[in-house]
């Protein structure tokens, strides 16, 4: 795909990296490049979260209890605040026998790689497969858990 005045945004991803380029024709301060690592590892650990001030131990215990009770959880926050990392941390509390379906537009959760012995269906939305379609199909997969990642406006 061309990257020029007519196509001023280029988004590229690899298995563990997301790259976004914005052309100088629309980024008047000059070419903008954004890199985001998306490794298939759990970077958050309970002791690190409490020790680094990420959150209080009671918050972590509350979230773990919410997972045990199959509560719906929405994780919101600013860019770079650790939403995906918190989600990856919480997935360890999903029982192996319970089917999980993930729906993402950019593959970042890596559920199957981080939980190789768990029942999982990973879906990716695309130009020809919308979030609406993915959710409709997901329900036919009989999930115990549905994980929706962030959605970009183009989807």
Description of each model-found segment:
Residues 26, 40, 80, 152-153:
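Short, glycine-/Ser/Thr-/acidic-enriched flexible segments
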Residues 83:
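Conserved lysine of the Walker
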Residues 2-69, 114:
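P-loop NTP-binding catalytic core
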């Amino acid at each position: 795909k061309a990257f020029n005045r007519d196509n001023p945004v280029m988004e590229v991803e690899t298995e563990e990296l997301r790259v976004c380029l914005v052309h100088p024709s629309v980024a008047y301060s000059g070419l903008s490049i954004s890199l985001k690592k998306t490794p298939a590892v759990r970077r958050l650990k309970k002791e690190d979260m409490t020790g680094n001030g990420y959150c209080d131990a009671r918050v972590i215990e509350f979230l773990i209890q919410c997972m045990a009770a199959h509560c719906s959880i929405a994780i919101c926050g600013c860019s770079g605040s650790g939403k995906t990392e918190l989600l990856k941390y919480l997935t360890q509390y999903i029982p192996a026998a319970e089917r999980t379906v993930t729906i993402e537009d950019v593959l970042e959760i890596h559920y199957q790689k981080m939980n190789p012995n768990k029942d999982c269906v990973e879906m990716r939305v695309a130009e020809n497969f919308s979030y609406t379609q993915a959710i409709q199909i997901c329900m036919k997969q009989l999930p115990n858990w549905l994980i929706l990642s962030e959605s970009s406006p183009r989807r």
